[in-house]
């Protein structure tokens, strides 16, 4: 992904413009309003299927919240038919020709995401966010084909040292 500090691009957020969180509508709404890509969060089902989920849960029509990691994809889809596999979101984002920022909270899903992104030819247009600085650096070192951004809990006082450390570990960027 080509990026400089002079290039600005706006990504649509999950649930933007009063769309439902964890769905495809925010990708379309953002694209319609001129966003240059989209952001979404993923969670992994008990049988290893990555799905859109902003909080790690799937919402059943009756309002029940089901932890995604506790159920198989089939069980989740039966209880929450609107549940979206991440592959559908990636394909939609690809057709919108924008950048993708995927929030992951567990690095175990990176293997599946990498395969899905590579298959959709979106690997170079995707940033993985949501991992702490140390974990992100470790993941970036082991996965040089992924653009990993490290999360900072707060802005440190030694900015130059931090930027240098991020560059030497292979991080795509930092986010505070």
Show the residue positions of the predicted features.
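Phosphate-group recognition and catalysis centered on beta-loop-alpha active-site segments
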Residues: 1-176
